[in-house]
Amino acid sequence: VTYLDELRDVIRRLHGVESTHVESVPIKETFQGKTVWEGIVEVFDLKNHPKAARIYAWAYERDNAKKPRHVTVLHMGPVTSPLLAVRAAIVQEYRNAEAES
């Protein structure tokens, strides 16, 4: 199973639709001069999704390298680019961490 196939499977499982890979976009997000996220965001077109025609997806390693964390962000509302998808995911993770503490 390739990385893109893995992401397609995650999209299918989470959103219930098929997807087609469009492009890979390198993103480097910095905050106060420090890199807070750097990686490749995969862009997919969605087939028959009720709210969005496109989705951004990526994975990153956590403590267990065999179980990466997969992230998907729908192209809707304020999220209109791979960079904005990364920013939205960072904000969401921060909020989740705040809620847990």
Where are these regions (language model features)?
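Mixed-charge, Lys/Arg-enriched low-complexity segments
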Residues: V1-E6, A65-S101
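N-terminal export/targeting and maturation segments
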Residues: V1-S24, R95
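Low-complexity, compositionally biased segments
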Residues: R8, R12, N48-K51, K66, ...
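Acidic, low-complexity, intrinsically disordered interaction modules
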Residues: T20-L84
